[in-house]
Regions:
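Short coil/turn segments at secondary-structure boundaries
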Residues: 19-27, 51-53, 132-134
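A short beta-sheet element
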Residues: 40, 59-122
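Basic/aromatic-rich interaction segments and small domains that mediate binding to polyanionic partners
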Residues: 36
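Short, basic/aromatic beta-hairpin or loop at an interaction surface
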Residues: 43-56
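A short glycine-rich beta-alpha junction/loop motif
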Residues: 31-33, 95-103, 112-115, 132-146
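Non-catalytic DNA-recognition/assembly elements of restriction-modification systems
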Residues: 1-22
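Active-site/binding-pocket entry motifs
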Residues: 15-16, 44-47, 82, 104
């Protein structure tokens, strides 16, 4: 089995990393009582989604911020807060929206098993401090590219 770094998969475009919409793009006033759920840091579990206190946005917001739509197999991390947690997006959450303080990892190559990656992120070999460093580097790289 080969050992591959996530950064190498990003560079070869086998995975895609995307930050959630910034506060200027998604305002608190856009949340509604009924609509499409928005996955925020508080909704991230350990490869699971916690639907308690989930917020929602309307169709116009979803259309405008379609680049932040989640798909089955995506892995969502928090950019701040509980960085040791993540959510593996199932068919149930397909079409939901990624929240502002989240980072989405999307597998673009069939040779990479997204579910395996999600399980790997749960193992003890991933130190939470390492995850903090990874998130800071990812955020820095994403901001520098713009």
């Amino acid at each position: 089995m080969d050992t591959v770094l996530i950064r190498d998969l990003v560079q070869t475009q086998e995975v895609e990393i995307k930050t959630g919409p910034f506060g200027t793009q998604l305002k608190a006033s856009e949340y509604v009582d009924r609509g499409t759920p928005v996955l925020n840091v508080r909704n991230l579990g350990f490869s699971t989604v916690n639907t308690e206190k989930i917020e929602m946005v309307g169709n116009e917001t979803i259309k405008r911020l379609s680049a932040h739509t989640l798909h089955t197999g995506d892995i969502v991390f928090g950019r701040k807060g509980a960085v040791e947690r993540h959510a593996f997006i199932s068919e149930f959450e397909d079409g939901w929206m990624q929240g502002s303080d989240c980072i989405r990892l999307r597998v673009k190559n069939e040779r990479i098993n997204a579910r395996y990656l999600s399980y790997y992120f749960l193992t003890l070999s991933i130190d939470p401090l390492c995850l903090v460093c990874v998130h800071m580097v990812l955020l820095w790289r994403l901001l520098i590219k713009k």
